[in-house]
Design a protein with these regions (language model features):
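N-terminal export and membrane-targeting signals
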Residues: 1-22
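C-terminal region of N-terminal signal peptides and the immediate post-cleavage residues
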Residues: 24-60, 132
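Beta-lactamase-like hydrolase cores
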Residues: 43-108, 178-187
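Mid-domain, small-residue-enriched loop/turn segments at the edges of structured enzyme/sensor domains
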Residues: 86, 145-223, 230, 261-264, ...
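Active-site SXXK
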Residues: 97, 111-129, 225, 252-253, ...
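Small-residue-rich helix-loop
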Residues: 100-102, 308-461
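Short, well-structured active-site flanking segments
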Residues: 126-140, 261-267, 371-376
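A small/polar active-site loop signature that marks catalytic segments
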Residues: 221, 227-374
Length: 461
């Protein structure tokens, strides 16, 4: 008999429902965009109408398990694509944990953003899903520093400087305007704003990061308080980032309080005065969703520090990495071969094995760590959401995977990776991880084709 979690888990059922619904949407979209001339419409009128009936479809208890031989045969052609470069991978039956295929799956490779699956998994194991980060404004010593208030960073990187009613990039973001309103209501006459950036320790830029990525919009220095994750254009995904995000947050508060932003500076020590204002971030589960769907590097680094704090480690790059890998390892997830310097996967010094990644996804799909199960729902949907919204939409195997495959992507120069879950043609749920280093110019298409085979293949023999 199957474990009860497999048949009745709310998260698994919801995930399957979403996958089926997206598959229907993709199919309908394909029909609607296949041609709009009159002759096509007239021809279609004579054909039987297709029925689109999305529904919650439970995973079959009796679906056949793919064989290793069948899997190897099905993957032979896509694995041979030279654009995959140096490829490692692993495929596992989600229900039993049986390894079905592997290629050098214990070889450490540069994982890129699939590293975020570890950060998300450890966060789900460690933190409350409703956990929020609090940013405060505290009065400095009014005897020695009259009129000075201190913006105290609580680790939230996505405070919004947008005025009330204006959309922000991050759903549910706390607002500088709310802090300013509360400070005004306190009755203090503000003359200057300082910033307490002391929550995080160590460097704010990880080894193996390229400073050019600040201007390319991929990252900013990781500081204890930030506005819009350091974006200089708050509602643009690829906006260049700031090199001084904490001071920018202080300047935004100063401007909202009609104080000269040019006078903003760092506080010399944490303030001990009266708290004047506070705001809270979105809940952890929403922040994880944003991190995974958009592959948000800044969000990943700050969530890693939350895990570090909860496990008694320094809120630094090293502390976060130790906390994330340590929590997973102590929970039974194999971290052998993992060597990381950040929580986002942006560093070229990061190394993970395909087995590490597949074990994380497998733990989310398996019976032993139910706290990790929401990870499946956080993964982008092929052809439907996040970083997979424009992938798996061309080519036979890739198109058939749209709506059925969910995976975290990874992409750096000549690096492509995928780690996720898919239901095969026989109704069997498989987990997988592929890492391609030294990839060719069509490496991303090649790794998508490889993953796409898992959907079309029953692989029973």
């Amino acid at each position: 008999m199957s474990p009860p979690w497999w048949r009745r888990s709310t998260h698994v059922v919801l995930a399957v429902a979403v996958i089926v619904l997206v598959a229907v949407v993709v199919a309908v979209a394909a029909v609607m965009t296949s041609g709009g001339d009159t002759s096509s419409a007239q021809g279609a009128a004579g054909r039987p109408r297709a029925s689109a009936s999305p529904a919650v479809v439970p995973v079959s208890d009796s679906a056949p398990v793919p064989t290793a031989a069948g899997m190897t045969a099905a993957l032979a052609a896509p694995v041979a694509d030279p654009n995959l470069g140096n490829l490692t991978g692993r495929i596992t039956d989600a229900k039993t944990g049986t390894q079905l295929w592997e290629q050098r799956s214990t070889l450490p490779m540069l994982p890129a953003s699939t590293n975020k699956t570890l950060t998300a998994g450890a966060a789900l194991l460690t933190l409350d899903r409703d956990a929020r980060l609090t940013t405060t404004v505290v009065a400095a010593d009014q005897n020695s520093q009259p009129g000075v208030v201190v913006l105290v960073g609580g680790g939230d990187p996505v405070l919004s400087a947008a005025p009330p009613g204006q959309e922000t990039w991050y759903r549910g973001a706390a607002r500088i305007s709310d802090l300013a309103d509360q400070v005004r209501q306190s009755g203090i006459t503000v003359t200057r704003v300082q910033v307490d950036n002391s929550l995080f320790s160590g460097p704010d830029f990880a080894p193996g990061w390229d400073p050019a990525d600040i201007f390319g919009g991929d990252i900013a220095p990781i500081q204890a308080v930030m506005v819009d994750a350091g974006r200089t254009q708050p509602t643009t995904d690829e906006s260049r980032r700031s090199t001084t995000p904490a001071l920018d947050a202080g300047r935004a508060l100063a401007a909202a309080l009609r104080v000269d932003p040019a006078t903003v500076s760092f506080a010399s020590s944490p303030p001990t005065g009266q708290q004047l204002a506070s705001v809270q971030s979105a809940p952890l589960i929403e922040r994880l969703r944003q991190m995974m769907l958009a592959s948000d590097n800044v969000m990943a680094e700050t969530i890693g520090r939350e895990v570090a704090k909860a496990t008694g480690r320094p809120q630094s790059f090293a502390g976060a990495v130790d906390a994330v890998t340590g929590k997973l390892a102590s929970s039974g997830v194999d971290m052998t071969g993992a060597s990381l310097v950040d929580s986002s996967g942006l560093s070229v010094l990061d190394r993970l094995t395909a087995k590490n990644l597949d074990e994380v996804v497998g733990a989310a799909a398996g019976p032993n760590l139910p706290a990790m199960r929401p990870l499946l729902d956080l993964l982008p949907i092929a052809g439907g959401s996040g970083t997979l919204s424009d992938r798996f939409l061309a080519g036979d195997a890739r198109t058939s995977s749209a709506g059925w495959l969910r995976a975290k992507t990874g992409s750096l120069t000549a690096i492509n990776s995928l780690a996720g879950v898919v239901t095969d043609a026989s109704g069997r749920v498989l987990t997988f991880a592929f890492i391609s280093n030294d990839a060719g110019p069509t490496g991303r298409l090649a790794i998508d084709a490889l993953a796409g085979v898992l959907r079309t293949c029953g692989c029973g023999g």
